[in-house]
Amino acid sequence: GALEAAYAGAVKARTAALNALQAQVVALPEEARAPLRGKGSSELVRACASMRPGAGSSPETLAKVALRSLARRARMLDEEAKGLEAEIDALTKALAPSTRSLLGAGPHVAARLLLAAGANVSRLRSEASFSMLCGASPVPVSSGRADRHRLSRAGDRRANSALYTMAITRMAHDERTRSYVARRMSEGKTKKDAIRCLKRYIAREAYRALAQDMEALGMS
């Protein structure tokens, strides 16, 4: 939990520094802005971090000081985030190998699932209770149609977020998942409904993997 929080904080601060850097560049006079125009974030950070403002207190000099400071801060935070991500990657591989083996379960997804499971060990006693924990249990909707459901909004937001990330990743990179979603939509379901079905399927996979990992850790 602490590593994920630290990573999220570093990413948020990095984004803020990059946004501030972009804003400073936009505010530059045209002549000073021209060499920086069209650069991507990485190129912009590299260019601004290596600026040499020189002495003096002219507006251009002070602007370059600010740009260099923001760029170096963004670079430092990027390195911090990458370091924390590497720690999370190693930790989840060691603690949750079965969960990490699931398609779409990268370090942050596995960490969120592991944290949710660790905080709610009793919910791992059955697939149904875990699905409810993840907010992946279908709830009937009063729409006049017997086949209309929504997912429960109750449950652990970390686990729900992890399942959603896995679903989107699979839809982007896995042909079988794309075929599954297409088939569900051909049956009359909306894309949102199809994703709900997919999340329920993934919840079943995640339950089995987490149960194995938690048992290996002596937490089941």
PLM-predicted stretches and their roles:
Residues 2-98:
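Glycine-rich, often acidic, oxyanion-interacting loops/wings at catalytic, nucleic-acid
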Residues 4, 67, 113, 162-167, ...:
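Short alpha-helical scaffolding segments that buttress acidic/His motifs in well-ordered protein cores
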Residues 17-18, 81-82, 119-122, 169-177, ...:
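Short helix-capping/linker segments at secondary-structure and domain boundaries
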Residues 21-24, 34-40, 142-146, 175-182, ...:
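Short coil/turn segments at secondary-structure boundaries
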Residues 101, 107-187, 191, 220:
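Phosphate-backbone recognition surface of nucleic-acid-processing proteins
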Residues 185-220:
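Basic, amphipathic alpha-helical segments enriched in Lys/Arg and hydrophobic/aromatic residues
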